[in-house]
From Swiss-Prot:
Pfam families: PapZ_C (PF22740), RapZ-like_N (PF03668). One of its GO terms (molecular function) is ATP binding. Keywords: ATP-binding, GTP-binding, Nucleotide-binding. InterPro entries: P-loop_NTPase (IPR027417), RapZ-like (IPR005337), RapZ-like_N (IPR053930), RapZ_C (IPR053931). This is Nucleotide-binding protein MAV_3359. ATP binds at residues 18-25. The lineage of its organism: Bacteria, Bacillati, Actinomycetota, Actinomycetes, Mycobacteriales. It comes from Mycobacterium avium (strain 104).
Amino acid sequence: MDAHLENGAGIDVVLVTGLSGAGRGTAAKVLEDLGWYVADNLPPQLITRMVDLGMDAGSRITQLAVVMDVRSRGFTGDLDSVRTELATRNIAPRVVFMEASDDMLVRRYEQNRRSHPLQGDQTLAEGIAAERRMLAPVRATADLIIDTSTLSVRALRETIERAFGGGASATISVTVESFGFKYGLPMDADMVMDVRFLPNPHWVDELRPRTGQDPAVRDYVLGQPGAAEFLDAYHRLLSLVVDGYRREGKRYMTIAIGCTGGKHRSVAIAEALMQRLQAQHGEAQLSVRVLHRDLGRE
């Protein structure tokens, strides 16, 4: 059984927050579809009251998700007090922080022709920057950070479902994400590894148009001197980290593997690493998926 359910007298609490335009509404809809009771834009001081109602005998609320944003007065300061107050009820709420790159947020606001809640007389970019600064302390203590910059609605739904669709699951959810350094670092990565030390298939004419998912490219990358040794060593390191996460009660982990463009080397290594993690730990202990962030961008 989920530790949050065991400690919380039968109620699991998730606080969904993050940057405006990063997908809080979509996350809320997915949670609602999964059977969670969702309260949107509930002021922090009313959260404990809602939890108390859910803990009352006869209440059918066992999974409560609260969507919060900076328009709630005293948001950042009150959030800590809410967590402290819930701790007195033996409830440790999980905080989900939604974010996206500045460029993507600007694009979304321009497409929807909406103003940012903190924009005021400033530019849209300045409003986004102000919110990012304001929410930095919240992001630093979040249990799960979801970067929606390159996620489709379907991919976001799958991410939420994996994290919260099985309330009784005690597995650790691991995402192995390939990316290209020239497109920037993944904002939600817990660990980043650079595999540009391996020869680049881009310079092999017959391999250039293919990707790291192609058997010929995979064999080329994994057959390079040092590739197998690197996989062995990095897999051992990740196994230690996974065990540490489990001891600390953490449930989510994103491992980013980068090469120049995110097309060949990082893709092949990410696929191989995912297979090794699955083979060693099994689905009962580890839920592993692979995500190729920049595949198809070239």
